Amino acid sequence: MNMPITNRTVAALLLSMALLTGCGETEATVDGRWYSPSQVATGKALFADNCAECHGASAQGTQNWQTLGADGTYPPPPLNGLGHAWHHPLKGLKRSIQQGGVPLGGSMPGFAGQLSDADIEALISFFQSQWPTTTYQAWLDRGGLR
């Protein structure tokens, strides 16, 4: 049985397509940054479980983080925008979390076998959400999204 295509049928199809188009949109970003609110929420939980013991609950780092310790390593730096994390592009931040800080003179273990790429991006989104707008913009200006 063939149904005639009427203006009403076409209108219903177009309306259905328009409504479905909105279903595939991605989540909004946080203040125009590269990450979403859900990434920050996931990252906050992951940070608490994997990073806060050394870097502090608010990613504030340790005192004298720029001074070489007696063991020959640097203490955990702040990741909240007050340290040097913003000097590194996203790829470099991911690599540091995957490989750890030992190659750079620190003692942080690598998390490549424990955290997925999505987990690592969520961690970064959490501590970057602590960065003031001026710090985030300076990071972008340095090519942070490379």
Regions found by a protein language model. Give the residues of each.
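Bacterial N-terminal signal peptides that target proteins for export
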Residues: 2-11
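Sequence context surrounding c-type heme c attachment/ligation sites in exported
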Residues: 41-52, 88-94, 117, 140
